[in-house]
Amino acid sequence: MTPPLGDIAHVGHAQLFTPDLDASVAFFTDYLGLTVNGQDGDTVYLRTYDDYEHHSLVLTARERPGLGRLALRTSSEEALQRRVAALEAAGRSGKWVEDEPGIGRLYLTADPDGHEHALYWESEHYQAPDELRPALKNQPQARPNRGVGVRRLDHVNFLAADVLANAEFQEQLLGARPTEQIRLDSGKIAARWLTFTDKSYDVVYTEDWTGSSGRLHHIAFAADTREDILRAADLAIDTGVFIETGPHKHAIQQ
């Protein structure tokens, strides 16, 4: 049975593992313009300026880089319970934890590829300190005066050994809708873009050519304009940030 639309309200935050925590924090604050909003041991919580929640990104020190969890906020407590019931009825294992500041209990599970997902409802609204208080009341935080100044976390692109199985997990158990895909001449689905909202996409699965499971392709942050993207490229060149590809856009959804 297809889940009701709207049980997943939006992408909440993502967690990345890093072998150099200080350098990673510097990249996200100095270059992208995120703000540190707390630290607990080897874990740092950062936020984009237009996020109403406590954090948008979690950086945790680990020996090897990688993806931790993707957190998805539900539209209500009832929606959270519906998704948990659907996951358990489908045989997906999970557990409840309460281990993040500003967030209530989270239900941890994983897609078929092993990417950890956290579903939650309870969330504290961010209250900016005086030095970050915005002039506009409907803006959670003043726009940063450094770096790119990205507005919000936009989407996560997972690498997957089996794109179709993982995409169907999102569709059948979490309520995502496909908006774009790459189908090879053989009929195999090599990539699929999915959304929980009215955006083009929130979650993407791309075939991992190595056949590995549980890896990350990229996370993406939203800027306001095309000019912001070009400015980000200029800042990358000026500050020594490596540009792997682009700027470019998708052929279909752009």
Region roles according to the model:
Residues 210, 216-254:
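Active-site/pore-lining binding-face segments in mid-to-C-terminal subdomains
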Residues 1-22, 67-70, 131-164, 177, ...:
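N-terminal beta-strand motif that seeds the catalytic metal site of vicinal oxygen chelate
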Residues 199-214:
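Flexible internal linker/loop segments at domain or repeat junctions
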Residues 1-4, 85-149, 192-193, 240-254:
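Vicinal oxygen chelate
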